[in-house]
């Protein structure tokens, strides 16, 4: 009897658990390893909460098989062989110009190439009807996808998934504000142009112009994406931007403690640090041995994958190795590309440096002997460093990296160093490194950032899981969607009111002004003649 009772209890517990388990699709195109890892963490957290998760990895770059993106969820892998090379070429092109300052036209051109290549891959994926039918049969309750390209949201709508969640994988960019018709704070946040801590008039103007131009560009590219979906699913298929504007929740994969403080939305939830393992301290003996070197500690150097050390100007790494020699009391760990033979060869004669194409970054960041992290300011690395309390020297190259580096500088736990310094002015970069190693305020502020993040009333996992379950359970939360999300740019910024008022004001000012000038001119030219006639 007791056995039967125990079995019934187990069955009831199983049924109760099953009721709250949802079928969820995580849409994860392979745009880079860091994005695969970020989406893998989202999938794992949903699975850890008891949900049935399908992690759909579309291999845009041929990197899915070698990237450990998820630990708990089995990956569903889709190949896109036709458009893969075109997408690779675009990213390779970014690597080749990473040391340049592209300006507005370069920014526009780069975005057009990226979105065109992505849209072509999206179109190729849409033609895989067998995969579509297989996914449609699973009757998903929820859908997650990033903001880099909004192809996934059109796909989710076609699958009939009504609860859709937008993941902003980097700080809230101006075009994501534009999705919701939420005015972006161009005066204070450097979205698409560099701005000093106290922005000048020119910096604010450039940021506004670049942001507005990019918003218009994305609207145009999204129109083309909608055309692709209507060709596939019929002319009555809604526009993809409209689908995105009605996403239930925007999950920001960033931390508000790290980012610029800026206006937010009722359906925007920060989940920075989700899935980051703060207990990752174990490392292989070879790396443990390296961490013991250096009388005053260890310095980590990694520029990510876009600023590839095998494709950027050789002088960059040669200059850095020259700086390494001037700090003999510190041991340097350098992550260099596996094809970068030049850096590895030049490092052989330097006693205080270790070069590898892979380093256990999370474990190194949590090691007590690490003094600073020199990074390109990619967000995954920033979150890991923030949670470890490690001060940063950032060398931003492109994308969200400048925005990230300025936020770190603003909050006092890092130094922003211009990418041209290692190329043209290594002495200035050396001065930045000396400042970091001799000024304890950076470490103090990094520890404060760490403590603020870890002591927040509600952690990233609780925010993420509870919000997701709450939304699906209640059939969406339209009550949180912004009222102005369907407005045009003209209505959203009240241009239809402001412009006519300005014209009226100008008219009221200009007409009297010209009358005054005309009267003055007339009097100066003819007044003396009229006066003479009167005297006569």
Swiss-Prot record:
EC numbers on record: 2.4.1.17
SUPFAM superfamilies of this UniProt entry? Answer: UDP-Glycosyltransferase/glycogen phosphorylase
The molecule here is called Putative UDP-glucuronosyltransferase ugt-47
Q: What species is this protein from?
A: Caenorhabditis briggsae
Gene that encodes it: ugt-47
Membrane topology per the entry is: Single-pass membrane protein
Keywords from the UniProt entry: Glycoprotein, Glycosyltransferase, Membrane, Signal, Transferase, Transmembrane, Transmembrane helix
One of this protein's Pfam families, by short name?
UDPGT
What InterPro entries does the entry give? UDP-glycosyltransferase (IPR050271), UDP_glucos_trans (IPR002213)
* Span of the signal peptide: 1-21
PANTHER family to which the protein is assigned, alphabetical: EG:EG0003.4 PROTEIN-RELATED (PTHR48043), UDP-GLUCURONOSYLTRANSFERASE UGT-47-RELATED (PTHR48043:SF13)
Going by the entry's taxonomy, the superkingdom of the source organism is recorded as Eukaryota
As for subcellular location, the record says:
Membrane
Q: Reaction catalysed by this chain?
A: glucuronate acceptor + UDP-alpha-D-glucuronate = acceptor beta-D-glucuronoside + UDP + H(+)
Sites carrying a glycan are: 52, 308
Q: Which GO terms describe its molecular function?
A: glucuronosyltransferase activity; UDP-glycosyltransferase activity
